[in-house]
């Protein structure tokens, strides 16, 4: 009987063991290929966002300075003034590595950072903070889970230090992913229990396996590889060879005029046709009761700030506006939006994060927005005027003064004068 079982299952077990050994002992390092790295940097796929190998390879390239651009879906709004296009056209000293997806916010970004901590150390980054992230209940667990994987989990468990940030991250992970792998270890962290030697040995073993698995399968990744032509290359020939903001503005303004011709809301024609037009009447005053002042996202943002402080990262934060015509039509309250911006800025500035490009009042400028909430055309140009000088003249991170009160529910639900928060 045992012999028959071995004849059936033995080959499967041997094959599984060989695959495990192949992956476990596969080299974690990948050879640099600038062309491939440029393509993965602008792929804006779920894979390029949440997987380790492609972003680590690019961010560790000694011959090209790729800079993490953290955000959500704004990176997908390509045109002639998009930061990836301008950096390539004018051969700047850096290239953006675009990290974001629709529905992603600070919690996903934090866990993604755990995969590339050595590549963040003492570096500059760009971080877009969209006030729309700060909804009452935060974002849906399904959205979080879509951008989370086992490598992020073991990277987090390996690097956590048992501090308040680690405890909070573990608690949020259980909320967003109740059936997460290694749940017992995550629960220990959330409960402030110390991990045992056996726990740490298992984490280290699985972390090495996940890292090598990412390297092994990353070499076969082609998803998004051919998007470079659509996202970047097609715009290069439309821009003037000699850099000039005025000349670039003339080009992208003409493009914007052509592509916002079918609506009175200043939105790109395609977006208006596919996302707004059919429901236009229903959308009137649909956001009049929205508030972004009370949200767990404020605590999630503190996770990111804590990581930046630990890694001595020098970030510039971008706060985008809402399309003013859309804001008025949908009934979104301007005073609430600006109060949200002030709350975000207070959390940043009071802890020493003072590099902020605040465009929150520019949503009424012509051709500033691509759609309802995303920058485009002249908005990207304004973005570039703030970001390019920052990245082209690197400086070390300042000294930060973290305040753990920003992890509290009191702060997450506070809607008063920020200067009076105790």
Regions found by a protein language model. Give the residues of each.
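C-terminal regions of proteins
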Residues: 99-101, 336, 342-422
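Extended hydrophobic/aromatic segments used for targeting, binding, or gating
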Residues: 88, 293-299, 304-367
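Hydrophobic membrane-insertion alpha-helices, especially the h-region
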Residues: 4-26
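Short loop/turn segments at strand-loop or loop-helix junctions that form parts
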Residues: 71-72, 128-132, 270-279, 318-323, ...
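Loop/turn elements at helix/coil->beta-strand transitions in domains of secreted/extracellular proteins
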Residues: 64-66, 94, 121-124, 310-315, ...
């Amino acid at each position: 009987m045992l012999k028959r079982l071995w004849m059936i299952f033995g080959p499967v077990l041997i094959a599984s063991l060989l695959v495990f050994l192949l992956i476990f002992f596969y080299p974690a390092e990948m050879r640099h290929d600038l062309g491939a790295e440029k393509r993965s940097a602008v792929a804006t796929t779920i894979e390029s966002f949440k997987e380790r190998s492609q972003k680590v390879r690019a961010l560790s390239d000694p011959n090209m300075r790729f800079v993490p651009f953290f955000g959500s879906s704004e990176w997908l709004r390509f045109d002639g003034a998009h930061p990836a296009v301008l950096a390539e056209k004018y051969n700047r000293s850096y290239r953006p590595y675009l990290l974001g997806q629709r529905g992603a916010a600070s919690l996903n970004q934090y866990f993604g950072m755990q995969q590339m901590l050595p590549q963040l150390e003492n570096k500059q980054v760009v971080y877009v903070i969209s006030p729309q992230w700060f909804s009452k209940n935060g974002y849906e667990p399904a959205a979080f889970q879509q951008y989370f994987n086992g490598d992020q989990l073991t990277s987090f468990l390996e690097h956590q230090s048992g501090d308040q940030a680690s405890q909070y991250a573990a608690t949020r992970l259980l909320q967003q992913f109740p059936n997460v792998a290694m749940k017992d270890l995550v629960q220990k962290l959330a409960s402030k229990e110390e991990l045992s030697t056996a726990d740490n040995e298992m984490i280290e073993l699985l972390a090495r396996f996940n890292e090598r698995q990412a390297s092994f399968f990353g070499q076969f990744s082609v998803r998004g590889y051919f998007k470079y032509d659509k996202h970047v290359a097609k715009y290069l020939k439309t821009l003037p060879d000699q850099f000039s903001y005025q000349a670039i503005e003339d080009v992208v303004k003409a493009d914007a005029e052509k592509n916002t011709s079918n609506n009175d809301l200043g939105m790109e024609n395609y977006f208006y046709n596919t996302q707004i037009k059919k429901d236009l009447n229903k959308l009137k005053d649909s956001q009049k009761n929205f508030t972004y002042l009370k949200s767990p996202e404020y605590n999630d943002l503190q996770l990111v700030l804590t990581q930046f402080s630990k890694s001595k990262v020098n970030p510039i934060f971008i706060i985008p506006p809402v399309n003013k015509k859309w804001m008025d039509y949908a009934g979104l309250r301007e005073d609430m939006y600006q109060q949200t911006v002030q709350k975000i800025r207070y959390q940043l500035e009071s802890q020493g994060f003072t590099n902020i490009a605040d465009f929150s009042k520019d949503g009424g400028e012509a051709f500033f927005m691509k759609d309802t909430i995303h920058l485009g055309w002249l908005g990207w140009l304004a973005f570039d005027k703030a970001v390019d000088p920052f990245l082209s003249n690197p400086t070390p991170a300042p000294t930060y003064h973290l305040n753990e009160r920003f992890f509290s529910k009191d702060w997450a639900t506070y809607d008063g004068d920020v200067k009076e928060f105790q």
